[in-house]
């Protein structure tokens, strides 16, 4: 008589589950991978996440962001690639850092010498409780969008826009020409 184990199909629920969000943007996409801690009755900013200390922008492995084309984040140019997001929260503004160590575990190995860019954004206080940390994309257009971070009663907006607009415009024009060429070929086959 055999015994079959199904345990390999299940995992324990994580206290801070991973979330991956991807947004089609311009001629490519942006992906954010982060751990989603919850408030669970705790005071978050200023206590669990102290003011003035580097935070991994999530739980467990540092939050990462991937760009498949050059962009401007917070008004600063960033090459395509993978970056860790680190934040130094303050009561009225946050310092946002994109760091080259995209595989960092937490903020323990944070090295400011690996920073690609650094900028500040204002903190927006909200009326409604955001129980679990949430990253999202809002105000999307062909040329810009905002990466939103919400947790507890706090929200910040990180502006992202295409870099080197004239190059992207040329790529889009060439793609349109290729599509027209394909349509013309299909018409000749009939």
Predicted regions located by residue number:
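Mid-length scaffold segments of soluble, non-membrane domains
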Residues: 56-110
């Amino acid at each position: 008589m055999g015994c079959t184990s199904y345990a390999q199909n299940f995992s324990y629920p994580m206290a801070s589950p991973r979330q991956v969000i991807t947004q089609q943007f311009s001629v490519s996409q942006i992906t954010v991978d982060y751990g989603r801690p919850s408030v669970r009755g705790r005071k978050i900013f200023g206590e669990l996440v102290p003011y003035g200390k580097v935070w991994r922008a999530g739980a467990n492995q540092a939050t990462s962001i991937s760009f498949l084309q050059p962009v401007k984040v917070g008004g600063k140019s960033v090459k395509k690639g993978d970056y860790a997001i680190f934040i130094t929260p303050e009561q009225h503004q946050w310092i946002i850092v994109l760091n080259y160590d995209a595989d960092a575990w937490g903020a323990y190995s944070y090295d400011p010498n690996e920073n690609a860019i650094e900028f500040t954004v204002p903190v927006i206080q909200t009326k409604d409780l955001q129980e679990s940390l949430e990253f999202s994309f809002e105000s999307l257009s062909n040329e810009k969008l905002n990466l939103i971070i919400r947790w507890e009663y706090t929200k910040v907006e990180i502006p992202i826009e295409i870099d080197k607009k004239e190059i992207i415009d040329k790529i889009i024009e060439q793609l349109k020409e290729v599509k027209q060429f394909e349509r013309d070929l299909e018409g000749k086959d009939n």
